[in-house]
């Protein structure tokens, strides 16, 4: 099977070597589609480390066939597929807003449970869509259940996906770690670009590092919007989404909005767009 440029292909033997044959003491979580194990690879070659515990830690998922039961009802697949597989019918602006609101509501629900839940691996591939573009979050293999207070919790577990996690969240657990990930997803919805792409030019590979400075300037925002969205959005609404993404991407969790607040802002933006459309009729 052909491997896309920039991606490394691993055999089952490689994965077994990296995880000590999926030994129980390397298990770090379980999601709907399988078990998540901690493994180690060489930092330069990315080959399985010759000695476990040396090199770069990675999260490796071992899929289980039954994990796909019930997947058929989410006929549209993942948000990742629609944004980056270049389908003939790219997601429209209003659908992107709908998806953002759905994902934000799901996270707000988790964060406001009596025993709060942090997803810890929010990304476009974990946002599933049904035929009406309703959202379901998947893959809770790295999720943690509270109660959590406002203080950070230290963890030795691998968490999150590169490009969706702020550096400080690699060691500490905050309820707001999901908020940062959501900010990255908003940026991907705006631009149609992946959070990380090794094929992009140096300095542009990490989407947040590259484009975050442009989010607060209207004229610059226009230059980074997904070209497939041309004439579908108002500049005012796009700028409001960009400002919300910027707040979510704040390095200090204390300055980030809660997911409940994110939902409220997105609903206001959606109403703003509907008002704009109605005024043109």
Predicted regions and their residues:
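Conserved eukaryotic protein kinase-like
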Residues: 1-281
């Amino acid at each position: 099977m052909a491997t896309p440029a920039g991606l490394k292909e691993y055999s089952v033997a490689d994965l077994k070597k990296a995880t000590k044959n999926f030994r129980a003491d390397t298990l770090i979580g379980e999601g709907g589609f399988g078990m998540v194990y901690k493994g180690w690879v060489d930092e330069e070659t990315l080959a399985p480390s010759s000695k476990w515990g040396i090199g770069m830690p990675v999260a490796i998922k071992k899929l289980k066939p039954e994990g796909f039961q019930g997947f058929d009802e989410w006929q549209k697949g993942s948000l990742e597929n629609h944004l980056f597989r270049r389908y003939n019918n790219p997601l429209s602006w209003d659908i992107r807003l709908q998806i953002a609101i759905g994902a934000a509501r799901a996270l707000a629900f988790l964060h406001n449970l009596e025993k709060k839940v942090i997803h810890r691996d929010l990304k476009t591939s974990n946002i599933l869509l049904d035929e009406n573009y309703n959202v379901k979050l998947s893959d809770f293999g790295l999720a943690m259940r509270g109660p959590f207070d406002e203080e950070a919790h230290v963890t030795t577990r691998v968490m999150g996906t590169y490009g969706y996690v702020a550096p400080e969240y690699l060691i500490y657990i905050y309820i707001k770690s999901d908020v940062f990930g959501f900010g990255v997803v908003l940026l991907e919805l705006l631009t149609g670009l992946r959070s990380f792409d090794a094929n992009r030019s140096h300095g542009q590979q990490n989407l947040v590092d590259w484009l975050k400075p442009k989010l607060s300037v209207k004229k610059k925002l226009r230059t980074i919007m997904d070209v497939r969205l041309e004439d579908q959005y108002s500049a005012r609404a796009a700028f409001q989404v960009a400002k919300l993404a910027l707040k979510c991407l704040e390095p200090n969790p204390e300055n980030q909005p809660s997911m409940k607040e994110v939902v409220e802002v997105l609903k206001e933006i959606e109403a703003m767009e509907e008002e704009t459309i109605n005024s043109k009729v």
